[in-house]
Design a protein with these regions (language model features):
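Mid-domain Rossmann-like dinucleotide-binding core that forms the NAD(H)/NADP(H) cofactor-binding site
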Residues: 1-54
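Conserved helix-to-beta-strand junction in the class I
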Residues: 12, 90-94, 101
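Glycine-centered, small-residue-biased loops immediately flanking beta-strands
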Residues: 17, 96-97
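Short, acidic/turn-prone active-site loops that include or flank metal/cofactor-
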Residues: 25, 102-106, 130
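C-terminal hydrophobic helical "lid"/dimerization subdomain
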Residues: 31-43, 54-65, 70, 83-90, ...
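N-terminal Rossmann-like NAD(P) cofactor-binding module of classical short-chain dehydrogenase/reductase
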Residues: 73-76
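Rossmann-fold NAD(P)-binding glycine/threonine-rich loop
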Residues: 82-86, 90, 102-122, 136-138
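Active-site capping/gating segments
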Residues: 124-142
């Protein structure tokens, strides 16, 4: 969802001047930079900054320095972690809003928040799990026009026969979104595993090549190839 949010943030009408993306893993940062580069963001008029907060001595101080001390108008939290929530609360600008997008499963999940800032700096905290029907329509329309890249979120592809086991074991299945084609039978398969499977299966070898020429992303060409193979 984080990659999808970055892609969306570059395209809406009242777009931000700057987007700062935080991670604690250089490999994931490099992957994000590969599929949504700083240069691509600049072409949309947005300054995009990727930072590894694990390498920071003082995370709050250094993140605020990226805004010249002003703070962030909007903070999105994509993990239900107390420390991350408290850090997000600490870097909001005046009249800022923090959105806890990651849904916690612990009914007692809580963290410390600055109620002084809530009163005097008009800071706000909200939680959301998705959008309205109109939001979905907008996303589909933008995807159809090529304005956003929903493919950056897809890491696995499978058929209808893979749904039950994938759903039951979702916490143990790494990666992002799992794309299901309901009219074919195919195990839920990671796009990154196509190359290994291609060592013994010519179809996956070709499918891997199609994805790799698209920065490792699923595409219309890959989809057409899959559907033709399983028809």
């Amino acid at each position: 969802m984080g990659l999808g949010a970055i892609s969306y943030g570059l395209t809406f009408e009242n777009k931000p001047k700057r987007i700062v993306v935080t991670e604690i893993n250089d490999e994931r940062i490099n992957r994000a930079r590969e599929v949504i580069s700083e240069e691509e963001a600049a072409a949309h008029g947005v300054e995009l900054i990727y930072v590894n907060t694990a390498a920071m001595q003082d995370q709050v101080k250094e993140l605020l320095e990226l805004t010249d001390g002003k703070g962030y108008d909007d903070v999105f939290v994509y993990i239900p972690n107390r420390g991350v929530c408290e850090m997000g609360n600490s870097i909001m600008a005046y009249d800022g809003c923090m959105n806890l997008f990651a849904g916690p499963t612990d009914m007692k999940f809580s963290s410390m928040i600055n109620l002084y800032d809530c009163h005097y700096s008009r800071s706000k905290i909200i939680g959301s799990t998705g959008g309205t029907i109109d939001d979905m329509k907008e996303a589909i329309e933008k995807e159809a026009k090529g304005l956003i890249k929903s493919a950056v979120m897809i890491t696995h592809v499978g058929g209808l026969d893979s749904v039950v086991e994938t759903t039951k074991n979702l916490p143990e299945v790494p990666g992002g979104k799992k794309l299901v084609y309901t009219h074919i039978n195919m195990p839920m398969t990671a796009i990154d595993d196509f190359g290994k499977l291609g060592e013994s299966d010519p179809f996956f070898k070709e499918l891997d090549a199609v994805c790799k020429k698209n920065k490792g992303l699923w595409s219309a060409e890959a989809e057409n190839m899959l559907l033709e193979h399983f028809q």
